Amino acid sequence: MSLPYRDFYYPLNVFMHILTHEEGAVRYLHYGLFERPDDSIDAAQERSTELLLSRLPPPPARLLDVGVGLGTTLARLTRLGYDAEGITPDEKQAAMARGRVTVAPFETFDGGPYDVLLFQESSQYIDSDALFARARALAPRVLVLDEFAIEPGIMHTYDDFLHAAAENGFRVAEEIDLSMKAAPTVDYFRARLPRYRQALIADLGLTDQQVDHLIANGEIYSNYYYSGALVYRLLDLTR
């Protein structure tokens, strides 16, 4: 069995480890969208990608996948006939993606033009003002699937994100709240972390304290979602 999590970084290597041993493989790093409690995590993650793909113009539109993850979505876009490229500041992600991937921060990326920019859980790592200032120069459309905080202090806030978009000439063409479909992803890992404690320590070199921290954070994140402090949304922004 290939064990790619051994070459990845914390904490994503933890989630990759659990997916590999629970599901037999890991294709995605993003949240799943659960329709039923008995959905598999793989089916839920695939549903998330399908939702994103359903909003795209037909091939051969030119797309930039910002973040790339493991490269699964980028490879699929290429197979579908899109002129698709990826960008990530992380060399390990780029190596795993093995596609047309530039290793660079999005904020200074000088490429394009593109028809659509895709942010599948990558917008949260980029300052919102910088994101839309750069997006304005690259494409007329930004498609986002990500989590947001409602109040400041957890991560980028939804209001600040929309304000930055508007300041750079983007308007919301579509918005879908998927929070309750995404939340079971947190519960999936939260339920399995205690079971994999010793394996994570042995395989990844984690400490008991790190595993305890992940378990505690899982509880906090679950509460954030079910209390409405965190939301998960699809946003289609155009200018």
Label for each model-derived stretch:
Residues 1-20:
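N-terminal auxiliary segments of SAM/dcSAM-dependent transferases
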Residues 42-59:
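Conserved alpha-helix/loop element of class I SAM-dependent methyltransferases that forms part
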Residues 64, 68-107:
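Class I SAM-dependent methyltransferase SAM/SAH-binding core
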Residues 118:
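A conserved beta-strand element that flanks and buttresses the S-adenosyl-L-methionine
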Residues 130-142:
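A short glycine-rich, Lys/Arg-flanked "PGG" loop and its adjoining helix->strand segment in the class I
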Residues 140-151:
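Conserved beta-strand signature within the Rossmann-like core of class I S-adenosyl-L-methionine
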Residues 154-169, 175-176:
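Short alpha-helix
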Residues 180-239:
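Conserved Class I S-adenosyl-L-methionine
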